[in-house]
Amino acid sequence: MWMLAALLLLVPRSGKAATLEKPVLTLHPPWTTIFKGERVTLRCDGYHPLLLELRPISTLWYLGHVLLPSHKKSIEVQAPGVYRCQTRGAPVSDPIHLSVSNDWLILQVPYAAVFEGEPLVMRCRGWYDKVVYKLHYYHDGQAVRYFHSSTNYTVLQARASDSGHYQCSGTMRIPVESAPMFSSKVAVTVQELFQTPVLRTLSPQEARGRVVLRCETRLHPQKRDTPLQFAFYKYSRPVRRFDWGAEYTVPESEVEELESYWCEAATTSRSVRKRSPWLQLPGRGPVLDLASTTAPVAQAAALGPGDKPLSFRKTPVSRSVQSVTSIPNSTFAGLQFPAGHVATAGPHACAPLPASAEQSREALQPKVDLLLREMQLLKGLLSRVVLGLKDPQALHELTETPETPNSHVTVNPATPETTVMEGRVDS
């Protein structure tokens, strides 16, 4: 009867067997590297059902693929390897890698995963706690911190860029001060707390006829209870500051500029902040975004608490070419622009020119022709002045030929005719 009651505790109302979460394996002290001869304690925390057995087995321990003889909740170990545990009816726990060293100097890092925004603590430890002097910490071969004697190195708010290989060096007095000694390199990985957010529009059914934007992201499974806040921006202007809601309703007056929106997700302490790419509407290609040329959106790098993103975003202009329009210009006629691509300082195209503009263009044509002829004469004059400076004798010979252009030009503004006055350049 009691056995039946115990089994019923594991069967929910749906009739399906309950799925138990895997147990949590912890290490004390919390360092993955120890000196030879030292011992550490492993503890397995999980669900332990009350089974009516004479000798209930509540915990299983594994070293690699070998089953250890102990069935206690905690065990002491000193052998290197990969440890796991399992409770009755639950999956196997995540592993803990334990290293044992016989060096004079070891670098100890936490066994548990370190997530973005959390402190990352490392300890450079001398043989059986001897004091380490002239202590240096290295990240991927570069010195990042110096201490006079034994001190932990702490990164207050870890970032993905803090991942890599760490090492330490220093001296010890055994009994006199030794030469600098180096620890082995240790790999450290900073886990992503949540993914880079993506801004999307809700379907008309979900939005109930409105235009609603949703900032979507996903937390790491081990941190799924971490609260996040969201902010929405239009260009670089915040339209809704950080709040718990992941949705924002766009005003009707701004619906035409949806592609200028982006969002940001952050923890409540703002220790981790990540911005989304610009909103991409279905069926449209990438929008002109000058900011992305200097900082690719793919990284969507996490912003610091004080960072203010800038935007140089412009409204896109259609690239379809249907016809060619001739646009008059006060300084040069005949400039050709594809229809819809007339010169403009704003995002909207100019309106078609009226018939009076065409008449104005015809009136300006003689003046433009006159200006072109004057420019040709001035070009010839300047070329001869330059030739005279370089070779006066050659210029003297050219001025005696009947084809020599005149060097003095006057223009009668009343007519489009050009009056030429004879003259010559003295060599």
From Swiss-Prot:
Bridged cysteine pairs (disulfide): C44-C85, C124-C168
The UniProt entry's GO biological process terms, in alphabetical order, are: negative regulation of immune response
Q: Which residues form the Ig-like C2-type domain?
A: 23-101, 103-189
Q: By its UniProt entry, which Pfam families does this protein fall under?
A: Ig_2
* Disordered: annotated span: 401-427
Task: Report biased composition (Polar residues) as residue ranges.
Answer: 401-418
Record's keyword annotation contains Signal: yes
Q: Which UniProt keywords apply?
A: Cytoplasm, Disulfide bond, Endoplasmic reticulum, Glycoprotein, Immunoglobulin domain, Repeat, Signal
Is Cell cycle included in the keywords of this UniProt record? Answer: no
Q: Which PROSITE patterns match?
A: IG_LIKE
Alphabetical list of InterPro entries matching this protein: Ig-like_dom, Ig-like_dom_sf, Ig-like_fold, Ig_Fc_receptor, Ig_sub
Query: In which compartments does the protein localize?
Result: Cytoplasm; Endoplasmic reticulum
Look up the record and report any one GO term of the cellular component aspect: endoplasmic reticulum
User: So which residues are the signal peptide here?
Assistant: 1-17
At which residues is glycosylation annotated? N152
Conditions for induction? Up-regulated upon cell cycle arrest.
Provide the free-text tissue specificity comment from this protein's UniProt record: Expressed at low levels. Expressed in B-lymphocytes. Detected in spleen, lymph node, kidney, lung and brain.
Alphabetical list of PANTHER family matching this protein = FC RECEPTOR-LIKE B, IMMUNOGLOBULIN FC RECEPTOR
Q: What is this protein called?
A: Fc receptor-like B
